[in-house]
Amino acid sequence: MTTPGPGPRSGEPARAKHVELSFLTPDGRRNRTWARFGPDSGPLSRGPVRTRNTLLNNTVKCVQVRAAGTDAPGGAQAAFASCAAIDAETAVALRLHRALGAPGASGPFPVLIGYELDAAEPFALYRPPRGRTVERMHGLPGAQLRVIEQELVDALAVLAELGLVHHGIAPETVRWDGRRIQLWGLDAVTHTGRPRTPRGAAPYAPPEVREGAGRSDPRDGLWSAAQVMYSLVTGRPGAPDRPPPDLADHRSLAHTMGSSFAPRAADRPTPAALLALLAPDRAPAADRLPADGLAAHRAGYDRALASKRPAGAVAPGEAVGEAVGHPAGAPTGEVLCPYCLEPIRYDPTALHTPDAVQELRPYNPHAQPNPRLLADELRGAFQLCPGNGTVREHHIPVPYLTNGRPLTVAMIGQSNTGKSHLLTQMVAEIADDRLKPYGISWQSVNPRQHAGFLNSRVVPLRDGRVLAHTAGLGQDETARFVESLLITDASGRTRPLAFFDLAGEDLLRTDALLRFLLGIDALIFVVDPTIAMPLAQLDEVRTTLDQHVNRDGDPAFATVLDRVPRTGPYLTVPSAVVVAKADLLRSEPPVDRWLGEPGHTALSRRRLHEESRDVYALLDRDAGKAWLRPFDTALHCTLHVASATGGRQEDSRYPRGVRAQRVLEPLLSLFAMHGIVELPEGRPVDEVDR
């Protein structure tokens, strides 16, 4: 974040005026200092970012790589892409910093000194580039060429061990100072196994990357490294999609990098194997990197999942069958009233419709002879439910009673955890037909109520406004769903989907208000990382919101888990745990892997398993066992990361706009457990393109 400073001193050009620059250091500490910026210069990669020299406190030279603003060509859409590139680049730089330590001037990668991802133009700060780009370095001595070759492959081997792939290696991103290389273009680094997106130009970008075919492979970068070496040896670019025709004339290059010119990644060696050939005395990258800090916690997930299997637990993404109740469309025609939990069936003699002032008046469907008009009127009609001794009479939308067994979902978490924002974006994504790839179509249960939800929640949030806190209910009020939809699956079965979203303080009550939980079909437990995780980079957010870390877990979780009935050692209601506000952790592994995925990435059972394993490990390490109680209690439970907004709020607005990330994955997991969608098995990351 920047604040205008006192302005330039006498004789300084206007562009060099001082501003106060605020950023986080790689260890999560807030730093504020005066800065002067030079003009935008040539990019250090081919990505959608801007670069300029920067002077901090009149002494520290650095380079600022920043996102383009909304005034850049392409407008808001290009700005979002640019912000996403900075997010991804910073996550990579932080991962390298933590894996390699704070490298000195001889390190193979750019040295990160700070970053700010929630500024209007998010940025990262690096030490100045070392050496010169190799674009015009034809004629280097053979000894130097061998060092460049070894260091390029070594850098790719390090990235591969970290689960990363560099898609931006080209002469302008490789620098050489006579002794060591420095590899820039971190915005072009992606995760192994992620779908390739078209990027780069021939001959340096591999054919599969230029075409956006298949999935990212650590061997992608070897093609680019080989092309860079060919240009250094010959002074000209190589062939775009095959080995250079004169490769045999350059015997040393053909011996070391010949196999790296294979057009398909699957036909190239791995970086580790090639490094062993080029530098047999150098320790493998795996031996030089610190142990994975989450490995032991992932193993804990495996043990916890295995302990549930004797009780009937299924793998993530599989249907759990009768454990979740009767199938949709039970032949009795009865459904459970979501409010009083009494059986109810459609009764044409108990219908009401709203008048001009929204007062419910008796409605006789037999008075409407036109079948089309009757169907439309019934969509807006309500049926009186007499209630019981605890819950007074109330009204249920007619389509809720006439479309099979409803699926009711409750959002669980204390106040300010982001439940309402997450639910709002779930509904918005459904309304945008984001479930269509899974064969699911939708329609509102009650058009007027749905329009009210869109106007009161979706429109303000997508306009960048922070939603008001959910109001608490009075002692005599009944919990009601806030939105309901009709969903039709790929087989043509339709059923209502209804969401409950209560205030956090109401979820702590032990009176009749929470009786709706006795008939609930699915639970979404929302974890707020600012309350759950004592990470340094979250301290500033906690201070702003006057929040504190609670190592004892969310009290709303405990109340709900105690209230929902169970018939054995485990709760059988399908559940999902969601680390919400995950944008606050978007540069943290493993959150960066999942949150940075393209929105079109298909879900599979294997991916659900991998994400659940990662999120369990994250919570186990950084939050503690109390925050994993929903997973330990529920027989069928997956874990997820999601962000409803994509960034932090400021003065009741989201200054960068709003971008939903992974908000539907928890719901899709619940759909899979209920047999509404059938997810493919998928394949492991280490099998990509084999």
Placement of each model-derived feature along the sequence:
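ATP-binding glycine-rich loop module of kinase domains
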Residues: 33, 42-101
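Short beta-strand micro-motifs within the conserved protein kinase catalytic domain, predominantly
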Residues: 111-120
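Conserved short submotifs of the Hanks-type protein kinase catalytic core
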Residues: 119-132
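Activation segment signature within eukaryotic-like protein kinase domains
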Residues: 148-149
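Catalytic-loop of the protein kinase fold
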Residues: 156-177
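A conserved short helix/loop substructure at the end of the activation segment
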Residues: 262-273
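Regulatory extensions appended to serine/threonine kinase catalytic cores
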Residues: 286-319
